[in-house]
Amino acid sequence: MALGQKLFITMSRGAGRLQGTLWALVFLGILVGMVVPSPAGTRANNTLLDSRGWGTLLSRSRAGLAGEIAGVNWESGYLVGIKRQRRLYCNVGIGFHLQVLPDGRISGTHEENPYSLLEISTVERGVVSLFGVRSALFVAMNSKGRLYATPSFQEECKFRETLLPNNYNAYESDLYQGTYIALSKYGRVKRGSKVSPIMTVTHFLPRI
């Protein structure tokens, strides 16, 4: 009788261990099923990743194209319409700044004054206009190479701005090629058709 009871207890304990082992295996299987996706799920995820990858590539391509277009727009905006307020200094004689007086006269002044402050505006690539800030008059040049001032912008107000090797600028009439803004050693304007860019009288340094 005692031997039978011991055998029953031993078998019960073994069954308990076996049952615990089975439960552990079932739980482990559930975990593995949660971690490892099914083949269909894998294919779906790969498709999703592929679509996302193409979408990202496409969006980057579009962004690059937009950046290129924006760069062109920025360049156009930079080259056309930018304004600078400067004084144009000509290093002849004692040195003169180009000035535009209210009565329409244009000349050189040794000392800086409100009439020597010019607004240099880009109107085309490499072409600018010169506007007297205080006098509210544009610098213009006629077909004879004579400078004059006008309250309204016109074709004779366009000057081609060229950077020279000495870092000075030369201002050539865009309408009448070969005529330049120039100041004599006495500060008087010279006829633009009588000078050339190799002459110091046509060299101007923009100053703030």
Swiss-Prot record:
Top-level taxon of the source organism: Eukaryota
Glycoprotein listed as a keyword: yes
Keyword Disulfide bond: yes
Stretch forming the signal peptide: 1-37
GO BP terms, alphabetized: angiogenesis; cartilage condensation; fibroblast growth factor receptor signaling pathway; myoblast differentiation; neurogenesis; positive regulation of cell division; positive regulation of cell population proliferation; positive regulation of MAPK cascade
Compartments (UniProt record): Secreted, Extracellular space
Chain positions carrying an annotated carbohydrate: 45
An MF annotation (GO) of this entry: fibroblast growth factor receptor binding
Protein family membership: Belongs to the heparin-binding growth factors family.
Protein name as catalogued: Fibroblast growth factor 6
